[in-house]
Amino acid sequence: MATPVKLQFAAPKRGMPPVHMADLDEETLKERVQELGLPKFRADQIRRQYYGRLQGDPMEMTDLPESKRAAVKEALFPELMQPMRNMDADDGETRKTLWRLHDGTMLESVLMRYPGRATLCISSQAGCGMACPFCATGQGGLDRNLSVGEMVEQARAAASTMQEEGGRLSNIVFMGMGEPLANYKRVVETIRKVSAPAPDGFGISQRNITVSTVGLAPAIRKLADEEMKVRLAVSLHTPDDELRDELVPVNNRWSVEEVLDAARYYADTSGRRVSIEYALIRDMNDQPWRADLLGKKLRGALGTKVHVNLIPLNPTPGSKWDASPKDRQDEFVRRVEAQGVPCTVRDTKGQEIAAACGQLAAEER
């Protein structure tokens, strides 16, 4: 019997970052602005600059009194994250950014450009406590949860980059470092902020936001009750409990059946189709019978409200596993679709710079 893997649902007790303007609601921001000796309406100007014009430096907010900009910066705009390194791949279409946070913690985010859209893969935690053995992030353990401000700042930085290029950040996927539903409250607040229209947010449609989870079943149901329109992606990786206990250790807490029941509740409540993420690993979870079982289970649990996203395993340092050969991958797709479940192979970006799914490790190399 395998040795139980220790999971980290609660982040270690570490100091959270200083409060940033993006952490505050409208009324609290007005109070803070008044404490600086400014009238309330200046709070609206700050919000329009930050969310509407993507300006993160009060010293450049020309509609604020010049004599007050330094005070606004000190009180409301602490430097939460500093870019340490950018790495580009896919002929410049993919950029991975390594960030150093205020306490020295490191994290990564990935901006991916596609024809007609730009997607940010955002981190919700520094590290991850779910301990999936094929994922570089999970093997590094959990440092701490990210604040709302730290997540919103990842989005603002990416949106600003796209604006400079004459484009627009259109999609956000919570598929970076961390288990989003283990940082539940802050992730939900971040979603509401980035999806609100300016000057309350960046105006990114909730339908263009995806939240990925390894399967925290109660949190999936709770997310459904938030009545948001974000897409749910469940990292399933195998349809049977025996193997999933090993590949996704949280399965020892919530079984495949419990996770799929929660996913069905989410689909019924939100009206959104659920995405099932499946990293295809050679001789581990790519057998024809597993493809058949996956299709049958998903069809039974979710009916037509499901889509399988097959991910060729991305290499990580020291891993004993590798991706399935293409002929086996194609056969897997065929068998899943034979059960009436749509199945596509993900267009993996950023593999050469360790920016693809499961590769983020925030190492300062």
Swiss-Prot record:
GO terms for biological process: rRNA base methylation; tRNA methylation. [4Fe-4S] cluster binds at residues 128, 132, 135. The keyword Lyase does not apply. It holds the Pfam family Radical_SAM. S-adenosyl-L-methionine binds at residues 178-179, 212, 235-237, 314. InterPro entries: Aldolase_TIM (IPR013785), Elp3/MiaA/NifB-like_rSAM (IPR006638), Methyltransferase_A (IPR040072), RNA_MTrfase_RlmN (IPR027492), rRNA_lsu_MTrfase_RlmN/Cfr (IPR004383), rSAM (IPR007197). One of its GO terms (cellular component) is cytoplasm. Its EC number is 2.1.1.192. PROSITE patterns: RADICAL_SAM. Its cofactor is [4Fe-4S] cluster. Specifically methylates position 2 of adenine 2503 in 23S rRNA and position 2 of adenine 37 in tRNAs. This is Probable dual-specificity RNA methyltransferase RlmN. The gene is rlmN.
